[in-house]
Structures are given as C-alpha cells and as structure tokens.
C-alpha cells in the first residue's frame, strides 16, 4: 500500500506551537468510525459521549527531560544528546548531534562535570550507546540538566514543562508525551468517575520511533521501532470486567491502543497482565481485537499514526475528517485538538 494514500494538505499555521491555557478547552471532533459522520465539539463535551460502564485506558508514562547539552572533554565541542531507551544500568541508546564527532571512547561532560557519558558503541539508525557516570540519583540530575524533547515541528519555547505531561503521568521513561492525554484535567477525570466511567492505566514508554517518518515507499516495507509496555493484573481484570458487562474499552491515544492490541494479539484475543517490547504496526486491513473507541490528536501526513486511525475507521473517513479539520481550522499535532473515533450511531440507537 502506497504511503502517499495517507497524505493531506496541512497549512503550517495550523500546527499548534503552544498548549492552550486550559487543557479541556481544546476542540474535539467526534467521528463515527462506520458512517464517517462528524460532529464539532469541545473536549469537555467528551462527558456526554461516554456512558456508565465504559472504561478509558490511559498511558501513565512520564516524559523525561531527555535532551542534554554537553561538551566533548577533549575538544570542548558542543554535543546534543537525546536519550531514547535505557538498556541496562546506566547504559542508554541515544541520538547525538553531530553524531560524526562521537566515536567509541568519546567522553561527553554535562553541567560542568556533574554528569558524564562515555560512548561504548553504535545503535540503530545512526544512534550511539552511552554509559553515564555521576554522583547521586540519575533522574534528579537529569531533571536539573535536561530539557523536554519537544518534537521538531514545535519552534516555540515551552514555558511550563508540566504542560508536556499528562496530569496522571507517573512512570518516567518516555522521550515524548502521549499527547491525547494532555486534554484531561483532574476535574474532568473526577467527573468521568462520578458518571461511572472506569479509568484503567497502562504504561508504554514513547520512543522517537512513533514519530519517525515512514522511509519506505510502501507501508508493508516499514518497520516500527520497539517500545516498552506494561499492563498490570489490576488493569487486565478491570478491562475484562468491562467487556463481560457490555461496556466499551476506549483507549486514550495510539500508545494505549498499541499496548492493548499487542497483548490481545499475543494472547489469542485476551487481555492479561503483560510486559515486553512492541513493534506492532496497525494500518488498513488490521483487525482490532481489544478496543471499541479511540481518543487521539490530529497526526502528521503519511505518519504511522494516521495509518493506525485509518485502520480503526477507514482511510476515506479519516482523510475526509482531516480535510474537514483543516477547513475548520483545528489545531494539529502534539499541542493540538483531539478526535474521538467510535461507533457513535450504534450507541445512540441502543
């Protein structure tokens, strides 16, 4: 399948550069996955589309301030390091700029020596393996020296780094935020609970592979970067109860979707406690096994994420919705607006 089938025209001014002042005031497009019908709402209206017995699945990963600026100890040359994946102990897979300056044995110093890293090898797609040395607690030092790794299409400086975290972020380890969750406030989550909507939590640590462009000409040639996920026994039990009672499982974001669909694929359609690495790639033709609805942001043209949404509805519905979003001047990408995709007409006719 040609990746150009998932292209659309996006004016640059619709790429959201900063978050809205209030999270839940973002717009919400409600898309019927079967009919393609569209409604234009605001995110707080999600309350009226969720019913008692439904369950939201939220990714409680926390974004690391994963971008570090340092110098080569031997020459003083500036080096930028982006942490991607912790391998074992203090060893990390990273991306480095400029990579050609960092060879095996190169030592990089950060924060006047508060943190040091030695290159111990190469990694996938031009990356480097670094081993860090420090006194104290690594994540406390990272919090002091690191910057939030905002996507390259965001040019503005983020004034408040908490705005690139969900309000329920807990498990540190992501190189990017699960952005569909950025629209929820603690108050909105409480209202959902009072309505009888369940909240289930999983972890998937988002790597840059999620956002890497598809380099192949056809979808089938593209391979996803693996990301770590975890689902507890408590979450699995809650989701299975929801299914047994006739409720809907609605994932908040493509990361939650990938986690549930990975587990269901690996366990004959069942949801159970599991941890591991997933490189699942969902595009039209994929049959969903676990979810009934999806809340997600508006994604980049020709990205694996718009392909996932197209798999859940269909390509024509999704591209029509995206063109409508452009026409109505929705805000796109990480700090942009949201879409709720489900079989809404069926629910109304129950």
Swiss-Prot record:
Q: Which UniProt keywords apply?
A: Cytoplasm, Queuosine biosynthesis, S-adenosyl-L-methionine, Transferase
Q: What is this protein called?
A: S-adenosylmethionine:tRNA ribosyltransferase-isomerase
Q: Which gene encodes it?
A: queA
Q: Does the keyword Ubl conjugation apply?
A: no
MF-aspect GO terms: S-adenosylmethionine:tRNA ribosyltransferase-isomerase activity
Cellular component, GO annotation: cytoplasm
| SUPFAM superfamilies registered for this protein in UniProt | QueA-like
- InterPro entries for the chain: QueA, QueA_dom1, QueA_dom2, QueA_sf
EC number, as in UniProt: 2.4.99.17
**Source organism, top-level taxon:** Bacteria
What is the similarity comment for this entry?
Belongs to the QueA family.
Pfam families hit by this protein:
Queuosine_synth
Species classification = Bacteria, Bacillati, Bacillota, Bacilli, Bacillales
Question: Native species of this protein?
Answer: Bacillus mycoides (strain KBAB4)
């Amino acid at each position: 399948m040609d990746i150009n089938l998932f292209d659309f025209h996006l004016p640059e001014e619709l790429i959201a550069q900063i978050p809205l002042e209030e999270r839940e005031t973002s717009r919400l497009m409600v898309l019927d996955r079967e009919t393609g019908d569209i409604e234009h709402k605001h995110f707080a209206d999600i309350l009226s589309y969720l019913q008692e017995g439904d369950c939201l699945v939220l990714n409680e990963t926390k974004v690391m301030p994963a971008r570090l600026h340092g110098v080569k100890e031997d020459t003083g040359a500036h080096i930028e390091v982006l942490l991607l994946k912790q391998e074992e102990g203090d060893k990390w897979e990273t991306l480095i700029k400029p990579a050609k300056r960092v060879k095996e044995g190169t030592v990089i110093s950060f924060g006047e020596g508060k943190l040091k890293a030695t290159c111990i090898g190469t990694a996938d797609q031009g990356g480097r393996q670094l081993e860090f040395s420090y006194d104290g607690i690594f994540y406390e030092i990272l919090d002091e020296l690191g910057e939030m790794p905002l996507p390259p299409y965001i040019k503005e400086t983020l004034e408040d780094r908490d705005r690139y975290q969900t309000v329920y972020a807990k498990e540190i380890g992501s190189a990017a935020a699960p952005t569909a969750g950025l629209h929820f406030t603690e108050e909105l989550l409480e209202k959902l609970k009072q309505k009888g909507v369940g909240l289930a939590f999983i972890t998937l640590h988002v790597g840059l592979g999620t956002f890497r462009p598809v380099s192949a000409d056809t979808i089938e040639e593209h391979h996803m970067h693996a990301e770590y996920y975890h689902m507890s026994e408590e979450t699995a039990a809650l989701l299975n109860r929801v299914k047994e009672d006739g409720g809907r499982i609605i994932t908040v974001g493509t990361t939650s979707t990938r986690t549930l669909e990975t587990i269901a694929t690996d366990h004959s359609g069942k949801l159970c406690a599991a941890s591991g690495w997933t490189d699942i790639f969902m595009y039209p033709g994929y049959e969903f096994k676990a979810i009934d609805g999806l809340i997600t942001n508006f994604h980049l043209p020709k990205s694996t994420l718009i392909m996932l949404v197209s798999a859940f509805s269909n390509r024509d519905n999704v591209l029509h919705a995206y063109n409508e979003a452009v026409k109505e001047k929705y805000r796109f990408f990480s700090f942009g607006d949201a879409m709720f995709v489900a079989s809404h007409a069926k629910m109304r006719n129950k």
